[in-house]
Protein backbone atom coordinates (compact mmCIF):
# COMPACT_ATOMS: atom_id res chain seq x y z
CA UNK A 1 0.00 0.00 0.00
CA UNK A 2 2.88 2.39 0.71
CA UNK A 3 4.16 2.36 -2.88
CA UNK A 4 1.05 1.55 -4.92
CA UNK A 5 -0.26 4.16 -7.37
CA UNK A 6 -3.80 4.45 -8.77
CA UNK A 7 -3.86 3.33 -12.39
CA UNK A 8 -0.27 2.08 -12.30
CA UNK A 9 0.41 -1.67 -12.10
CA UNK A 10 2.79 -3.22 -9.60
CA UNK A 11 5.11 -5.92 -10.98
CA UNK A 12 5.83 -9.20 -9.20
CA UNK A 13 7.71 -12.43 -9.83
CA UNK A 14 5.95 -15.50 -8.45
CA UNK A 15 8.48 -17.92 -6.95
CA UNK A 16 6.44 -19.66 -4.28
CA UNK A 17 4.01 -19.40 -1.40
CA UNK A 18 5.20 -16.10 0.03
CA UNK A 19 5.30 -14.24 -3.29
CA UNK A 20 1.90 -15.75 -4.16
CA UNK A 21 0.49 -14.32 -0.93
CA UNK A 22 2.08 -10.93 -1.62
CA UNK A 23 0.54 -10.87 -5.09
CA UNK A 24 -2.91 -11.65 -3.67
CA UNK A 25 -2.62 -8.84 -1.11
CA UNK A 26 -1.33 -6.34 -3.68
CA UNK A 27 -4.42 -6.91 -5.79
CA UNK A 28 -6.47 -5.26 -3.02
CA UNK A 29 -4.67 -1.99 -3.83
CA UNK A 30 -4.53 -2.02 -7.61
CA UNK A 31 -3.48 -3.81 -10.77
CA UNK A 32 -0.76 -6.46 -10.53
CA UNK A 33 1.50 -7.58 -13.35
CA UNK A 34 3.12 -11.02 -12.87
CA UNK A 35 6.32 -10.97 -14.92
CA UNK A 36 7.09 -14.65 -14.44
CA UNK A 37 6.14 -17.72 -12.44
CA UNK A 38 7.53 -21.20 -11.88
CA UNK A 39 4.25 -22.54 -10.48
CA UNK A 40 3.89 -25.07 -13.31
CA UNK A 41 6.99 -26.92 -12.08
CA UNK A 42 6.12 -26.62 -8.39
CA UNK A 43 8.43 -23.62 -8.04
CA UNK A 44 11.58 -25.67 -8.49
CA UNK A 45 13.47 -22.76 -10.10
CA UNK A 46 13.60 -18.98 -10.35
CA UNK A 47 11.83 -18.06 -13.60
CA UNK A 48 13.72 -16.17 -16.30
CA UNK A 49 12.35 -12.64 -16.50
CA UNK A 50 12.97 -9.68 -18.77
CA UNK A 51 13.25 -6.99 -16.11
CA UNK A 52 12.50 -4.32 -18.71
CA UNK A 53 8.91 -5.60 -18.61
CA UNK A 54 8.59 -3.88 -15.22
CA UNK A 55 9.03 -0.48 -16.85
CA UNK A 56 6.27 1.90 -15.84
CA UNK A 57 5.35 -0.09 -12.73
CA UNK A 58 4.77 1.51 -9.35
CA UNK A 59 7.31 -1.00 -7.98
CA UNK A 60 8.95 -4.37 -8.70
CA UNK A 61 8.67 -7.01 -5.96
CA UNK A 62 10.63 -10.24 -5.53
CA UNK A 63 10.96 -12.79 -2.73
CA UNK A 64 14.68 -13.41 -2.60
CA UNK A 65 14.59 -16.79 -0.83
CA UNK A 66 11.76 -19.30 -0.91
CA UNK A 67 11.66 -21.54 2.13
CA UNK A 68 9.04 -24.07 1.07
CA UNK A 69 10.52 -24.84 -2.36
CA UNK A 70 14.19 -24.20 -1.61
CA UNK A 71 15.08 -21.60 -4.26
CA UNK A 72 17.10 -18.41 -3.90
CA UNK A 73 18.09 -15.42 -6.01
CA UNK A 74 21.86 -15.33 -6.41
CA UNK A 75 21.78 -11.59 -7.10
CA UNK A 76 19.32 -8.72 -7.10
CA UNK A 77 17.88 -7.67 -10.47
CA UNK A 78 18.35 -4.36 -12.24
CA UNK A 79 15.01 -2.65 -11.87
CA UNK A 80 14.10 -0.22 -14.68
CA UNK A 81 14.85 3.43 -13.99
CA UNK A 82 12.20 5.00 -11.79
CA UNK A 83 10.81 1.64 -10.63
CA UNK A 84 11.61 0.93 -6.96
CA UNK A 85 12.84 -2.60 -6.26
CA UNK A 86 11.10 -4.16 -3.25
CA UNK A 87 12.49 -7.34 -1.70
CA UNK A 88 11.16 -9.79 0.86
CA UNK A 89 14.41 -11.10 2.34
CA UNK A 90 12.85 -12.72 5.40
CA UNK A 91 14.37 -16.16 5.15
CA UNK A 92 17.96 -15.41 4.20
CA UNK A 93 18.86 -11.92 5.38
CA UNK A 94 22.08 -12.13 7.35
CA UNK A 95 23.12 -15.37 5.67
CA UNK A 96 25.46 -13.72 3.15
CA UNK A 97 26.46 -10.22 2.02
CA UNK A 98 23.76 -8.63 -0.13
CA UNK A 99 23.80 -5.35 -2.09
CA UNK A 100 20.82 -3.99 -0.21
CA UNK A 101 21.51 -0.50 -1.53
CA UNK A 102 20.06 -1.71 -4.84
CA UNK A 103 16.64 -2.13 -3.22
CA UNK A 104 14.42 0.85 -2.57
CA UNK A 105 12.48 -1.05 0.08
CA UNK A 106 13.10 -4.31 1.85
CA UNK A 107 11.52 -6.19 4.69
CA UNK A 108 12.45 -9.29 6.65
CA UNK A 109 10.91 -11.17 9.52
CA UNK A 110 13.51 -11.73 12.22
CA UNK A 111 12.60 -15.33 13.00
CA UNK A 112 14.97 -17.09 10.59
CA UNK A 113 18.43 -15.59 11.07
CA UNK A 114 17.96 -12.45 13.15
CA UNK A 115 16.08 -13.52 16.26
CA UNK A 116 12.59 -14.57 17.26
CA UNK A 117 9.17 -14.19 15.68
CA UNK A 118 7.15 -11.03 16.19
CA UNK A 119 9.77 -8.59 14.89
CA UNK A 120 10.19 -7.26 11.36
CA UNK A 121 13.14 -5.34 9.95
CA UNK A 122 12.34 -2.73 7.28
CA UNK A 123 14.75 -0.60 5.29
CA UNK A 124 13.50 2.04 2.89
CA UNK A 125 14.97 4.77 0.72
CA UNK A 126 14.45 8.11 2.44
CA UNK A 127 12.79 9.82 -0.51
CA UNK A 128 10.02 7.21 -0.42
CA UNK A 129 9.14 8.20 3.14
CA UNK A 130 8.08 11.71 2.11
CA UNK A 131 6.53 10.88 -1.23
CA UNK A 132 3.68 13.37 -1.90
CA UNK A 133 2.11 10.90 -4.34
CA UNK A 134 1.86 8.14 -1.74
CA UNK A 135 -1.66 6.69 -1.56
CA UNK A 136 -3.77 7.09 1.58
CA UNK A 137 -3.31 4.32 4.11
CA UNK A 138 -3.97 3.83 7.83
CA UNK A 139 -1.38 5.73 9.84
CA UNK A 140 -0.13 2.62 11.62
CA UNK A 141 0.59 0.94 8.27
CA UNK A 142 2.71 3.75 6.85
CA UNK A 143 6.48 3.34 6.99
CA UNK A 144 6.87 7.12 7.39
CA UNK A 145 4.91 6.94 10.63
CA UNK A 146 7.31 4.47 12.18
CA UNK A 147 10.42 6.17 10.82
CA UNK A 148 9.44 9.54 12.27
CA UNK A 149 8.66 7.89 15.62
CA UNK A 150 12.00 6.02 15.71
CA UNK A 151 10.05 2.73 15.67
CA UNK A 152 8.20 3.78 18.83
CA UNK A 153 4.81 4.70 17.32
CA UNK A 154 3.36 1.91 19.45
CA UNK A 155 4.91 -0.26 22.15
CA UNK A 156 7.62 -2.28 20.39
CA UNK A 157 8.47 -5.92 20.89
CA UNK A 158 11.24 -5.10 23.35
CA UNK A 159 12.17 -8.75 23.93
CA UNK A 160 12.46 -9.30 20.18
CA UNK A 161 14.71 -6.23 19.88
CA UNK A 162 16.91 -7.58 22.68
CA UNK A 163 17.21 -10.97 20.99
CA UNK A 164 18.06 -9.23 17.70
CA UNK A 165 20.86 -7.34 19.46
CA UNK A 166 22.25 -10.55 20.95
CA UNK A 167 22.08 -12.40 17.63
CA UNK A 168 23.88 -9.59 15.80
CA UNK A 169 26.59 -9.59 18.45
CA UNK A 170 26.95 -13.35 17.99
CA UNK A 171 27.21 -12.99 14.20
CA UNK A 172 29.87 -10.31 14.61
CA UNK A 173 31.82 -12.54 17.00
CA UNK A 174 31.79 -15.36 14.41
CA UNK A 175 33.36 -13.10 11.81
CA UNK A 176 30.34 -11.24 10.48
CA UNK A 177 28.06 -11.92 7.55
CA UNK A 178 30.99 -13.01 5.37
CA UNK A 179 31.69 -15.82 7.85
CA UNK A 180 28.02 -16.80 7.77
CA UNK A 181 28.24 -17.05 3.99
CA UNK A 182 31.23 -19.42 4.18
CA UNK A 183 29.57 -21.63 6.78
CA UNK A 184 26.24 -21.73 4.95
CA UNK A 185 27.97 -22.61 1.69
CA UNK A 186 29.80 -25.47 3.41
CA UNK A 187 26.61 -26.82 5.01
CA UNK A 188 24.47 -26.64 1.89
CA UNK A 189 27.21 -28.10 -0.32
CA UNK A 190 27.43 -31.13 1.96
CA UNK A 191 23.73 -31.85 1.61
CA UNK A 192 23.35 -31.02 -2.08
CA UNK A 193 26.35 -33.21 -2.92
CA UNK A 194 24.74 -36.08 -1.02
CA UNK A 195 21.44 -35.55 -2.83
CA UNK A 196 22.99 -35.30 -6.28
CA UNK A 197 25.04 -38.46 -5.76
CA UNK A 198 22.13 -40.47 -4.37
CA UNK A 199 19.92 -42.93 -6.20
CA UNK A 200 17.29 -42.64 -3.45
CA UNK A 201 17.13 -38.98 -2.37
CA UNK A 202 16.31 -36.18 -4.81
CA UNK A 203 16.53 -32.41 -4.33
CA UNK A 204 13.41 -30.45 -5.23
CA UNK A 205 15.14 -27.30 -6.52
CA UNK A 206 17.05 -27.25 -9.79
CA UNK A 207 20.80 -26.75 -9.72
CA UNK A 208 21.69 -23.09 -10.11
CA UNK A 209 18.57 -21.96 -8.26
CA UNK A 210 19.11 -23.64 -4.91
CA UNK A 211 18.74 -22.07 -1.49
CA UNK A 212 21.45 -22.35 1.13
CA UNK A 213 18.88 -21.94 3.90
CA UNK A 214 16.19 -24.55 3.28
CA UNK A 215 16.71 -27.70 1.27
CA UNK A 216 13.57 -29.69 0.41
CA UNK A 217 14.08 -33.21 -0.88
CA UNK A 218 12.16 -36.41 -1.49
CA UNK A 219 12.85 -40.11 -1.62
CA UNK A 220 12.04 -39.92 -5.31
CA UNK A 221 14.30 -42.84 -6.17
CA UNK A 222 12.11 -45.27 -4.25
CA UNK A 223 9.46 -47.28 -6.11
CA UNK A 224 6.28 -45.21 -6.25
CA UNK A 225 4.25 -47.72 -4.27
CA UNK A 226 6.83 -47.78 -1.48
CA UNK A 227 7.78 -44.09 -1.41
CA UNK A 228 5.36 -42.86 1.25
CA UNK A 229 6.13 -45.69 3.65
CA UNK A 230 9.88 -45.32 3.14
CA UNK A 231 9.64 -41.55 3.67
CA UNK A 232 7.75 -42.09 6.93
CA UNK A 233 10.38 -44.60 8.02
CA UNK A 234 13.20 -42.20 7.16
CA UNK A 235 11.59 -39.37 9.13
CA UNK A 236 10.95 -41.62 12.13
CA UNK A 237 14.51 -42.96 12.19
CA UNK A 238 15.92 -39.48 11.66
CA UNK A 239 13.92 -38.20 14.62
CA UNK A 240 15.24 -41.06 16.76
CA UNK A 241 18.77 -39.98 15.80
CA UNK A 242 18.04 -36.40 16.88
CA UNK A 243 17.23 -34.84 13.50
CA UNK A 244 13.99 -33.02 14.26
CA UNK A 245 11.69 -31.03 12.01
CA UNK A 246 12.70 -32.75 8.77
CA UNK A 247 9.16 -33.27 7.51
CA UNK A 248 8.52 -31.24 4.36
CA UNK A 249 5.85 -28.59 4.00
CA UNK A 250 2.41 -30.03 3.33
CA UNK A 251 2.25 -28.38 -0.11
CA UNK A 252 5.40 -30.19 -1.27
CA UNK A 253 5.65 -33.25 0.96
CA UNK A 254 8.80 -35.24 1.40
CA UNK A 255 11.48 -33.75 3.63
CA UNK A 256 13.08 -30.39 4.26
CA UNK A 257 16.34 -29.53 6.02
CA UNK A 258 16.50 -26.03 7.49
CA UNK A 259 20.07 -24.77 7.69
CA UNK A 260 19.86 -21.23 8.99
CA UNK A 261 22.86 -19.46 10.49
CA UNK A 262 22.55 -21.11 13.90
CA UNK A 263 22.64 -24.63 12.45
CA UNK A 264 26.22 -25.95 12.81
CA UNK A 265 28.37 -27.52 10.11
CA UNK A 266 28.64 -30.59 12.36
CA UNK A 267 24.88 -31.00 12.07
CA UNK A 268 25.07 -31.03 8.29
CA UNK A 269 27.84 -33.62 8.38
CA UNK A 270 25.84 -35.81 10.76
CA UNK A 271 22.69 -35.53 8.65
CA UNK A 272 24.41 -36.45 5.40
CA UNK A 273 26.14 -39.40 7.07
CA UNK A 274 22.79 -40.63 8.37
CA UNK A 275 21.19 -40.26 4.93
CA UNK A 276 23.97 -42.25 3.27
CA UNK A 277 23.71 -44.97 5.90
CA UNK A 278 19.91 -45.08 5.54
CA UNK A 279 20.20 -45.45 1.77
CA UNK A 280 22.54 -48.41 2.16
CA UNK A 281 19.92 -50.16 4.32
CA UNK A 282 16.85 -49.15 2.33
What kind of feature is each model-predicted range?
Residues 233, 240, 249-282:
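PLP-dependent enzyme catalytic core of the Aspartate aminotransferase-like
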